[in-house]
Every structure is written in C-alpha cells, then in structure tokens.
Amino acid sequence: MAPEIHMPEPLCLIGSTEGHLVTNQEALKILSAITQPVVVVAIVGLYRTGKSYLMNKLAGKEKGFSVGSTVQSHTKGIWMWCVPHPQKPDHTLVLLDTEGLGDVEKDDKKNDTQIFALAILLSSTFVYNTMNKIDQGAIDLLHNVTELTDLLRTRNSSDSNQTEGEGPADMSFFPDLVWTLRDFFLDLQANGHAITSDEYLENSLKLKQGSDERTQTFNLPRLCIQKFFPVKKCFVFDAPALGSKLSQLPTLSNEELNSDFVQDLSEFCSHIFTQSKTKTLPGGIQVNGPRLESLVLTYVDAINSGALPSIENTVVTLARRENSAAVQKAIGHYDQLMSEKVQLPTETLQELLDLHRTCEREAIEIFRKHSFKDEGEFFQKELESLLSAKQDEICKKNADASAALCSTLLGSIFKPLEQEVAQEFYHKPGGHKLFLQRMEQLKANYRQQPGKGTQAEEVLQTYLNAKETVSRTILQTDQVLTDKEIQSKAEQERAEAARLEAQRLEAIRIQEEQRKAEMERQHQEQLRQIALEKARVAQEQQWILKQRAQEEADRIKAEQEAQLRALQQQLQHMREMNHHRRHHHDCVIS
C-alpha cells in the first residue's frame, strides 16, 4: 500500500501571471509523490456560487478552499487538495476548485476559457455549478460558444472521416458531468408529472426539430454537451439558509442549515464518492499523481504557446515523458540491484552474466510497470540498449578489478622470488632447475588463492612472459657454471676415489689387526675359563670330601647314640627289676 499524502490544506496548482498560466512547483511535487490512481473532481461555475463550499464538504473539512461571503471572487486560478479517497482503498481523491467564471472585475476573459478547458481535461468528474435553474445562459456557458469544441480536439489530424459536431474519438478520457443547481426554486414537474433532477437535465438538453439557423443555434451547444458528456448527473440544492445566515455558511452546523439542503449535500457527496471513476487516458490507462502532473504541465505549456491542447498529442507527450522516466527508473533499479548483488571481481564471467540477466529482467519489469503506450517498443529497445551498454561496462569493470587484484596478489606471492633473483640466488649450477621449481611452487600457490576473478590466468601469463628473460639469464649462467663444475667434479671424484681406496686398505689393515687381537683375547679368555673350571672342580671335590666326612661323622655319632640308648634301656630295665623284687620281698615277710 502506498503511503497517504498528508496535505492539510489546499494549494494553488495553476495560477496566472501577466496573461500566462503558471504552475506551482510545490503542488506539482505533491502530485509527483502520489503513486496511487487518482479520482479527480473539478468544479467550474460562475463566481460567488458556492463552489468552494461543496469542495470542502467533499474533502470532509469545514475549512480549506477559500469561501467568501462578499460579491468578490475569492478563488483565483485552480486550487488543488489531495486527500485519501474515503471509499476506494489505494486511491487518492484530487479536488480541483476553480476561479469563478464571469468575474466582472477580471479584464482577461480568455482566462475563463482556459480555466474551464483545463478543468474538463484534468478531471474524471466535472462538476458544473450554476444557480437556480438550467437556462440558455448556463448551457451557453458550458458550451462556451464554439471554443469548447476547438479546445477539446481529440481526433487525429489525418482523420477525415469524422465530421464537425461529432464527439471525441475516445470518450473514456472525458469526465462524467455532474450539474449542480444551487438555490433551486422550481418544482420538478413536466407535463403535470413529477420528474427527477436527472430527467430535468435531459429535458433541458433535448434537441429541437428543424434545420433553420435559429434551431441549429439552439441545438449546437446541447449537441456538443451530449457528445462530450454521455454520462450526466444532476443535483438540485435548496437554499442552505436564509437571510444573514448565508454570510456565515462555512461556520454553520448541520442543525443550523436547511434540512433539505443537508440531505441534498449528503446525496451529492455520496454520489461523488461512489460513482466518480478513476481518471484514465485513452486506452483505459489509469492516471496516478506523476501522470496527472505531466498532464498539467503539457496542457499549460500548450495553452501558453497558443496551441490547441490535443488530447492525442498530450497522450503522446505524456507517454514520452513517462516512458523516459520509466527507462531511468529501470536503469536506477538495475544499478541498485547490481551494486547489492555483485562483488567485483566475480570468479567467472558466467557468474557476472547470470547476475546481469537477473537484474536486467527485473529492470525490464520495472519499466513495463511504469510505462504505457510504448509504440513499437521504442523505449523498451532504448532500455535494452542501455542495459547492453551497462553489461559491457560492468564486464570491463569486472575485468579491471580482477586484473588489479591479481597484479597485487602476484606481487605479494612472487616477492620472495624477486628478492632471490635480485640476490643472484639462482646464479649457480642447477640454479635454473631450482628457479623453475620455485616458479611452479609459487604458481600453484597463486592458483589456490580464491576470488581472483576472470583475469587470473591472463595476468599470470603476462607476468610469466615478463620473466622469460630472467629465466634465460639464469639458464645461461647455470650452463656455464655447470661445465666448470663438471670438470671440478671429475677431479674431485678421482681424488675421492683415491681417498676411498686408501680408506679401504686402511680399513682392511685395521680389521686384520682387530681380528688378531680378537683371537688373542679369545685365547686368553679360554685359558682363564680353563683355570676357573679347574678351581671349580677342585672346590667341588673338596666339598664332596667334606660332605662325605660329615656324613661319616654323623653315622658314627648316630651309632654311638644308638648304643648309648640301648645301654640306658638295659640300665632302666635292671632298675625296674630290682624295684620289683624289693616290693615282692616286703609282701612275703609281712
């Protein structure tokens, strides 16, 4: 949902300076910010007939458009008030209050015609406000003699089939007509029957039969009005108040107003809110704030230049302006998307092209959303051409960014090699091989680094090509030093062979001496082992003899102990026998 436009009070949209119409930039800026479709209600009528009062009621405010209570006209030019539409979500109601027609104090009567024409051209509902009744003067004023048909040309200059008096080619562009009759005092009757206000309007615009000049003069404005305004509505208003209260009308509450007037006003506002259509261009293209702004500028420029504002040319001009703006909006959207999505350099060109195509599709969608009547896809082709140039530009930037990054990376990675070359580190036999190995190592390191972009190999190859001279110099130095080294190496090898032979012979001598020494050591060891064995055997024999002697002593001791025990037993036995005998003898005596 688009944000609501906060406009606390009306602003002058179109004024007049020294006979020329001028637009108010502040009001145009407000229009340019309204992205919603607009319902444009403009009111035109004689000065001092209460137009501003009706417009304030449509705005839902007691104050806003200037309401006067004197005979002087208050509103000058066209004033604009943009408010949220009370019954159509996502729509803005644009109210246009106009300078009163027929002001006796105004010198330039042509300005009336210009204001009148602009109100019709800009509105989707045109409110024609008159007093008392529909009379010939009111019809003539609406017709504005023959200037109305001239100012509202819509036919192609090449359209010769449309005859004078026919209506516009695309009636959808023209507003619905709402005729308001203020202080209406007549009875709504015809032929003795009650009629509606709409029937009263239709009866007032009926054509007379006949072809005489007087009849044609009578019919011409009516025919013109019928052709230009196929959708018509009429509202009649009783006097809002009586006497001195009329001068206080803006401050009166509904209770202080004529109840019939309050009812009439309510029905009028309800009709405007529910029936007023969105402003459209030929082809059914809805008008938003910027498109309405372009219409204002186009019509004012045409009128100031003395040209007649052709609706067809206006739509072409508007389409050109809006499509050009749509191209710029699409390009801006593309630039924003690319800046958000693309991080240069991309790893591959295809990655960048895929991002470009995604953003390109969105940009074209933005263009299609904000463009209209792009005949032959002229502006879309222009956009595609600009996007193609953008692609070339971003690809070049991508390549440049990749080249710069890779050059910096190469400088960092190959810096040690550069220092070694400067120090003639590779100016030695085999130096070229070492140089090439070092190059391969650093190239592998470089290729492993991520995010280098599309120029990685090209920048590397350029660097390697630049090092070809260095490589050849190292190779030549290597070859010269290698030849000398080969000769020196041969001599060194011969000397080394002699040294090795001497070492071999010396080793043989030493080994022989070591062998003899080892044999002597082994012989001595054998002798020592024999002596040790003899000593061990002798010691063992001595132990055996000692053991045997001990055993013999133990045997003898055991025999002696046995003999002693036998003797002791005999002695004990003898004692026992003696004791027995004594005891027995004692018994016999007693």
Swiss-Prot record:
Q: Which residues bind GTP?
A: 45-52, 67-69, 182-183, 246
Q: State its role.
A: Interferon (IFN)-inducible GTPase that plays important roles in innate immunity against a diverse range of bacterial, viral and protozoan pathogens. Hydrolyzes GTP, but in contrast to other family members, does not produce GMP. Following infection, recruited to the pathogen-containing vacuoles or vacuole-escaped bacteria and acts as a positive regulator of inflammasome assembly by promoting the release of inflammasome ligands from bacteria. Acts by promoting lysis of pathogen-containing vacuoles, releasing pathogens into the cytosol.
The record's family statement is:
Belongs to the TRAFAC class dynamin-like GTPase superfamily. GB1/RHD3 GTPase family. GB1 subfamily.
This chain's protein is named Guanylate-binding protein 5
Q: Quaternary state and partners of this protein? A: Homodimer; homodimerizes upon GTP-binding, forming a close face-to-face dimer. Heterodimer with other family members, including GBP1, GBP2, GBP3 and GBP4. May also form tetramers (dimer of dimers) in the presence of GTP. Interacts with NLRP3, possibly in its tetrameric form, and promotes PYCARD/ASC polymerization.
Q: Which GO terms describe its cellular component?
A: cytoplasmic vesicle; cytoplasmic vesicle membrane; Golgi membrane; perinuclear region of cytoplasm; symbiont cell surface
- What gene is it encoded by? Gbp5
Region (Required for tetramerization, but not for dimerization) location: 529-590
